[in-house]
């Protein structure tokens, strides 16, 4: 029997039933990813597995470095076949890592290859995969369509023109809805060059910015621009969740320092972060948006490699922080007190905080008619694993209502990462099936069908209301 077979990851009979009868064929609602809208719009031809597999994939790059592979085969200019062979050498030694599962799933799902990839057959599989891509005229749009994706939300800078989203919408024959999502990370980097650069770009698009009010007004204009283009989600990447009380005068002083390139203290940065989250949440709430917050990554930790290959290259890790429970609750409470807490999804990168997040969101489920208004987001990045998914779902089941979980997202730059939805659905089905067979969940097919289909698709569809 092939390693990737119909019962892969399904370790109980109920789980097999739940996956095959309820989960497997549900469409995909990918509400957070990093796909390039230009590549979708241009319907780029995909004719080389190395480009699909290794381009921009820092998960694989980390593993290759752990294997001792030279950088020229990772982020360098080595030939595609040579890079593929080096990845294969790494993959053979990645047993136990989800990369092994994902890669074999992708070979099966997108190339119809069931063989285990090894150094002995690497070159043959490389050519088989490339031939398959060419014979099937594979493109970015065909990969999305074949993956049964109904909706994609990309990740977009506040100053992006979103023209590619318009172009995608105008295309005939491509039925997946592709919408922008507002990602204003640089607004929190007060005192950094990225903040100054954002101010200049915003001024070019809106109006002169000399005060915090000018800044907020400019951002609100861009939020409305995204709204007019169909965007209904925002996402924020924060190193820490940290609340500090502030006054209008304090924010004005901090902003003036930023304009004058003066030093800004850590305390002032956190005051400004609290201010920005609060001001942005007003605009999101007024427009019925969903606010996402990803927190807990410490980035670019290897200075030598950052200077050599740049950011997002596989040198980030999980961080910890003091007093998270207070800071998280205080941030949400600020918005709740002022009457503008939007639908919110919290993604913690450090899994030891699962129960803190779970117990926090339960404090703010106070808007009648919205099921689990504040969500505990799916296992993210370093938790995008069997163990990470199970820990997140177990904590959510303990602390909240798993039945209303909005489920999986790819959070990926790869057009063949939709295998991760299948991976999640297998793990979910096996997890629920195991609880059924232990007598902890009723063996009621109507109940189980509703739970599986809700988590796989229906909850996201009803929560985001985008299509």
From Swiss-Prot:
Catalysed reaction equations from the record: D-glucuronate = D-fructuronate; aldehydo-D-galacturonate = keto-D-tagaturonate
Top EC class of this enzyme: isomerase
Pfam family, one: UxaC
Keywords: Isomerase
Gene name of the encoded protein: uxaC
Gene Ontology BP annotations: D-galacturonate catabolic process; D-glucuronate catabolic process
Species assigned in the record: Staphylococcus haemolyticus (strain JCSC1435)
Known EC number: 5.3.1.12
Gene3D superfamilies cross-referenced by the UniProt entry: Metal-dependent hydrolases (3.20.20.140), uronate isomerase, domain 2, chain A (1.10.2020.10)
Record's protein name: Uronate isomerase
Protein family: Belongs to the metallo-dependent hydrolases superfamily. Uronate isomerase family.
InterPro entries, A to Z: Metal_Hydrolase (IPR032466), Uronate_isomerase (IPR003766)
Alphabetical list of SUPFAM superfamilies matching this protein: Metallo-dependent hydrolases (SSF51556)
Isomerase keyword on record: yes
Entry keyword annotation includes Secreted: no
Pathway: Carbohydrate metabolism; pentose and glucuronate interconversion
PANTHER family: URONATE ISOMERASE
GO MF terms, alphabetically ordered: glucuronate isomerase activity
């Amino acid at each position: 029997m092939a390693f990737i077979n119909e019962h892969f990851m399904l370790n109980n009979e109920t789980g097999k039933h739940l996956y095959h009868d309820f989960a497997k064929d549900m469409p995909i609602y990918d509400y957070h990813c990093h796909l390039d809208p230009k590549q979708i719009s241009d319907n780029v031809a995909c004719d080389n597995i190395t480009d699909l597999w290794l381009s921009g994939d820092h998960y694989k790059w980390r593993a290759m470095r752990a294997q001792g592979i030279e950088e020229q085969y990772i982020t360098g200019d080595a030939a595609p076949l040579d890079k593929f062979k080096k990845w294969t050498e790494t993959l053979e030694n990645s047993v136990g890592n989800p990369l092994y599962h994902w890669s074999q799933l992708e070979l099966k799902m997108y190339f119809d290859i069931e063989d285990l990839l090894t150094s002995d057959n690497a070159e043959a599989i490389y050519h088989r995969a490339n031939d398959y891509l060419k014979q099937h005229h594979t493109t970015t749009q065909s990969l999305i369509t074949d993956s049964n994706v109904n909706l994609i939300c990309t990740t977009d800078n506040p100053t992006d023109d979103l023209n590619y989203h318009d172009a995608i919408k105008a295309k005939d024959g491509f039925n997946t809805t592709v919408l922008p999502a507002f990602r204003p990370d640089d607004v929190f980097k007060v005192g950094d060059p990225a903040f100054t650069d954002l101010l200049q770009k915003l001024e070019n698009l809106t109006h002169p910015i000399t005060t915090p009010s000018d800044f907020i007004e400019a951002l609100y204009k861009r939020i409305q621009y995204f709204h007019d283009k169909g965007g209904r989600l925002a996402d924020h990447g924060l190193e820490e969740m940290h609340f500090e009380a502030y006054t209008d005068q304090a924010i004005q002083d901090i902003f003036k320092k930023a304009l004058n390139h003066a030093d800004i203290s850590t305390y002032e940065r956190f005051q400004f972060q609290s201010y920005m989250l609060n001001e942005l949440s007003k605009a999101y709430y007024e427009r019925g948006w969903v606010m996402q917050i990803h927190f807990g990554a410490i980035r670019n930790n290897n200075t030598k490699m950052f200077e050599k290959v740049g950011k997002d290259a596989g040198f980030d890790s999980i961080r910890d922080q003091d007093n998270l429970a207070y800071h998280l609750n205080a941030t949400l409470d600020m918005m709740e007190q002022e009457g503008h807490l939007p639908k919110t999804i919290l993604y913690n990168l450090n899994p030891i905080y699962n129960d803190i997040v779970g117990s926090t969101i339960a404090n703010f489920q106070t808007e009648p008619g919205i099921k689990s208004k504040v969500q505990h987001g799916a296992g993210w990045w370093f938790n995008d694993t069997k163990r990470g998914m199970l820990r997140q779902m177990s904590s959510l089941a303990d602390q909240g209502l798993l039945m209303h979980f909005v489920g999986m997202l790819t959070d990926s730059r790869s057009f063949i990462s939709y295998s991760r939805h299948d991976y999640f659905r297998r793990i979910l089905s096996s997890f629920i099936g195991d609880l059924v067979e232990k007598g902890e969940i009723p063996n009621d097919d109507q109940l189980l069908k509703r739970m599986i289909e809700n988590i796989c698709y229906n909850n996201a569809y009803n929560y985001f209301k985008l299509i």
